[in-house]
């Protein structure tokens, strides 16, 4: 494990090559995958539930009579998971609810003289679809992170799709999370076919207004394909963490945090930017020690070799500059007073301050959303929030007197733009 992770001196050619490799790691879109996804979407649009059942048989090796999860199945799921897990999920849900409730925006109205009234209405979307990866790899945290903000936003109906396990049932931890989070309907459908069903509807599954949730490359391509017919949250890239630390950082903690993201997949990037040469050696030793006890050891090691890096810089301010260029999904600041640097962080999905605010805390429990922009998109994108589940409409009312007061001005602008019918719409009211 000698070359466990690359070490880069800031300003070197190695650094430039490394950052270029991060940009290129997802590669080009696969034409065969795009073709397959298009075929699946068209098939679901044409054949509805029949296509869903056939794809479940083909891809999940499960023969289903019905794709809808029953109330009895949801009730039975509670007996199949530990009480401690249920308790933990309830606490997480409460924290996520509390955090997201602060994001709620209210409608407003402005009244002016001469009978002018204008304002904005804010209302939840009618129907939202949540995609949750299923099978043996269950992620109940994805359920609550997507469903709770939708619920807080006032979404009328939340529909969830997730592939069944080999026994034809949905993973019980997923069902419990969905029930606690207030999901209204759950269907045993996965892959691109689930996205197609949510986007266009079938005999059983309602067409939704927005689709959220993570998935594999087929799910991602399907979401991209249906965007415009429905809204989507984002196309997520590989997981990322960038840790900024000085010499006071605990190497055990830093090594553990870097590996927590590396275990996602071999394209994940784990980066430490530090001012301390001594810390580098200690972190590498800790990685070697800790990785031996981890179930996803091979994935972690490959991710660290492929896209991991430790960058030596001469100051924390330079480390922050690098962080702002990378615009990582997760950014940790491990210094004696991390709050002094908070306002300097311009580009990051979520920021974790101090030694006892590790990234997995945000994944599961604290309250901020774990659905975050990746691949540098934190430069212009934000974490999933209540705002993603609402729509806003503006409205206005002018009395005759109010319109007469601005009549000439409106006409002048319309005529300058050459839109005479616009101008006529105003003029005709005062002839």
Swiss-Prot record:
Zn(2+) binds at residues 261, 264, 363, 422. One of its GO terms (cellular component) is cytosol. Coiled coil: none annotated. Substrate binds at residues 239, 261, 264, 330, 363, 417, 422. Its EC number is 1.1.1.23. The keyword NAD applies. It catalyses: L-histidinol + 2 NAD(+) + H2O = L-histidine + 2 NADH + 3 H(+). GO terms for biological process: L-histidine biosynthetic process. It holds the Pfam family Histidinol_dh. One of its GO terms (molecular function) is histidinol dehydrogenase activity. This is Histidinol dehydrogenase. It comes from Clostridium acetobutylicum (strain ATCC 824 / DSM 792 / JCM 1419 / IAM 19013 / LMG 5710 / NBRC 13948 / NRRL B-527 / VKM B-1787 / 2291 / W).
